[in-house]
Amino acid sequence: MIRSTFTAALHCQYGQVGVVDTPLWAHPFFSADQDGWLCTDYKRGDSVSFKPIEFTFTFIEATNGRLHYRINCATGPKFLSGRLEQNSNGWLGLYGYAWGDDLANCIFPPSLLARLPALQDTWKMELLGAWDGDLESAENVEFYLRDKKGHRVAQVEARYSRSSPPLRNWFLHAGNKEGDILRFHLHDIKVE
């Protein structure tokens, strides 16, 4: 696959990958809980909270048949340059994108270290088929996306029990939770 920095939309069998960005008027109590988490078009695309995004893939290295990248949001203004990372429970989201993060960095300077590229999560792309090296055919190559521990990214159901009845949503996850493993491919590739 592409061994340089590029920008592309990330798609899977459930459509385009996007981010939750819920307007306050839509869910005043839960919008802050969900904003920044990654989801798919199929499960959230019909809601006002789904925002399709593109990513910048910064190539790091190729080892053991896998390509390693740092991945950041390339769509703005709110999520521009947000880092694709996972929380301690394995949920995937964009980190370091909001002005509030900048304010927190001023108050707690050690959190500035998290912005250093060397400390950002890396993601492994495992191709599921051969690629002929032609950029135009790269959009047809499927791959798994794995976290630093080797877990494949899946779409997993999350329940919010603070409401009655509980809210059911699906987000991207890499870890031990049961879900549908995603087979990704790229769209609208732009090599830098």
What are these regions (language model features)?
Residues 1-192:
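Lectin-like carbohydrate-binding module/patch detector with strong preference for beta-trefoil
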